[in-house]
């Protein structure tokens, strides 16, 4: 079943769950599938002198389980699912100024609004870490687009597999 944005938003606000244990946010938040992200993000922060991070799409924070990360971290989501997550619409207004915006498994849900969202990100951060797919990745859903962000951002400066092979990659771009 393919839901419209409005229908999906309504389901989420009513407490829709992904049906997975430990998280309401889907497979991309499971500890097994976030292992590489939890490993490389602190390394990238050290390598590029990143001291502050906005997590744009933090969800229920399940993905960070057990992660040691010595940075100034602020979590945002359109529908906060954890007390430390603040409500924010990344498609409508720039995030507070930070070194890095982390937007893992989020842009893929807002495909028509990706260009305007990336323009807002460029106003807010020096770097972006986001989910990346190759240009030949097959589309499987109208709720999750396998986006090749190189179309808007060029080649990333870092790339790592993000979860199982079909989950795509976590890539890092310099925004300005």
Could you say what each language-model-derived stretch is?
Residues 1-91:
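Conserved N-terminal segment of class I S-adenosyl-L-methionine
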Residues 139-163:
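Conserved Class I S-adenosyl-L-methionine
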């Amino acid at each position: 079943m393919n839901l419209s944005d409005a229908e999906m938003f309504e389901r989420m606000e009513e407490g829709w769950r992904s049906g997975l244990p430990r998280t309401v946010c889907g497979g991309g938040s499971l500890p097994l599938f976030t292992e590489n992200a939890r490993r490389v993000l602190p390394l990238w922060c050290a390598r590029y002198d990143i001291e502050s991070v906005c997590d744009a799409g933090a969800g229920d924070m399940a993905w960070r389980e057990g992660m040691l990360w010595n940075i100034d971290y602020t979590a945002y989501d359109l529908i906060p699912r954890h007390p430390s997550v603040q409500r924010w619409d990344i498609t409508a207004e720039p995030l507070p100024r930070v070194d890095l915006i982390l937007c893992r498994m989020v842009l893929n849900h807002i495909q028509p609004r990706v260009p305007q969202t990336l323009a807002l990100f460029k106003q807010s951060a020096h770097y972006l870490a986001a989910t990346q797919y190759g240009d030949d990745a097959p589309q499987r859903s109208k709720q999750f687009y396998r986006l090749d962000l190189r179309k808007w951002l060029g080649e990333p400066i870092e790339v790592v597999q993000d979860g199982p092979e079909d989950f795509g990659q976590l890539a890092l771009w310099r925004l300005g």
